[in-house]
Each structure stands twice: as structure tokens, then as C-alpha cells.
Design a protein with these regions (language model features):
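Cleavable N-terminal export/targeting peptides
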Residues: 1-24
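Short loop/turn motifs that connect adjacent beta-strands in outer-membrane beta-barrel proteins
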Residues: 20-24, 50-59, 84-92, 129
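Transmembrane beta-strand segments that form the barrel wall of outer-membrane beta-barrel proteins
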Residues: 25-34, 56-69, 94-100, 134-140
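Membrane-embedded beta-strands of outer-membrane beta-barrel proteins
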Residues: 28, 42-46, 77-79, 120, ...
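Solvent-exposed loop/turn segments connecting transmembrane beta-strands
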Residues: 32-42, 65-76, 86, 113, ...
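Outer-membrane beta-barrel "beta-signal"
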Residues: 38-44, 149-162
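Residue-level signature of outer-membrane beta-barrel architecture
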Residues: 46-48, 81-85, 124, 138, ...
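Mid-chain, well-packed structural core segment of small domains
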Residues: 90-121
Length: 162
């Protein structure tokens, strides 16, 4: 958990150099997580049209569905923020989504069903409709349970704006 403040600080710093971008999006991510070396995770997200702007970042509601090769499922809803970096095609993204984690085995017990997913990433827009990003996410119960191992994932994310 000591790395979370560092990640949030880096995200805040990146936001200071970025400019807003907007559109509703569907995001599909594929990556790996730290339960073992050969585990894979697939994320599916929907981000609404921006509901507000905060420090130049477009903030949207987000719905998240994540499944992995250990038969774990996370379903959550929260907020997502995306900000263009200057006039370039590059952007930074971040999100926070509380939700429900359904473990597929005792090996992936995270302490309780209520979990929180945080995500930070950097990406590039290729046109008005498609972009690709690399993101790191963390799933944890935030210390609400005595047992709180958390899990990290790295995903390559394809975004489709409409």
C-alpha cells in the first residue's frame, strides 16, 4: 500500500501537463496479474460521456467487469478521468471503482467481497475513435478486513470512443 501514494502523486503531476478529451468509450483490456506468473486478466469497461471536468481532465462514470484465469470476477462502478497531454495524441487516465469481487479459489481470497479498484495509465489516440493505453491497476479492500493482500494487474487497453 506504500506505493499507492506514489502512484497517485505521479498521476496528479501528469494531470498538470494535460488538456481535456471527451467521448463515451468502451474499453477492452488484456493483461497479467500477480497471483502467479501465467495468469491472464480481461477487463471490459464502459465510460459515459464526461459529466464534468476536474483540473482539465474529463471525468465520466465508469462500469467495470474483470475476469481472470483463476475464475475470479470483479464487477464495479465508479469514476474515470482522462486528460490529453497538451496538443499531442498522448493522454493519461485514472479511475476508482468500488465493487464486488467473487473469488474463484482460496488462492485468490482478497479478504472480503467489497473491493476497490484503482487504475492509472498512459495512452495514445490514433484517431477520433480509437486509442491504446498501458495501465496498472490495484484491487484491494482498503483495509476494511484484517486480511488484505490486494492484487495488481498490468493491462494493454483498446479504447473505442463514440
Amino acid at each position: 500500500m506504500k506505493t499507492l501514494p506514489s502512484i497517485l502523486s505521479a498521476f496528479a503531476l501528469l494531470l498538470t501537463f494535460a488538456q481535456p478529451a471527451s467521448a463515451a468509450e468502451v474499453v477492452v483490456g488484456l493483461g497479467t496479474f500477480d497471483f502467479d506468473d501465467d495468469g491472464a486478466v480481461v477487463d471490459l469497461e464502459y465510460h459515459t460521456d464526461p459529466i464534468t471536468s476536474f483540473r482539465g481532465a474529463d471525468v465520466s462514470f465508469a462500469v467495470v467487469l474483470s475476469a481472470d484465469t483463476k475464475s475470479d470476477i470483479f464487477i464495479g462502478a465508479g469514476v474515470s478521468a482522462v486528460r490529453q497531454i497538451g496538443d499531442s495524441p498522448w493522454f493519461v487516465e485514472g479511475s476508482f471503482a468500488p465493487g464486488f469481487f467473487f473469488e474463484g479459489s482460496e488462492e485468490t481470497d482478497l479478504g472480503q467481497t467489497l473491493e476497490f479498484r484503482t487504475l492509472i495509465g498512459v495512452g495514445r489516440r490514433f484517431d477520433n475513435n480509437y486509442s491504446l493505453s498501458l495501465a496498472a491497476s490495484h484491487l484491494s479492500n482498503g483495509g476494511l478486513s484484517d486480511f488484505n493482500p490486494g492484487v495488481n494487474a498490468i493491462t494493454l487497453r483498446l479504447r473505442r470512443s463514440f
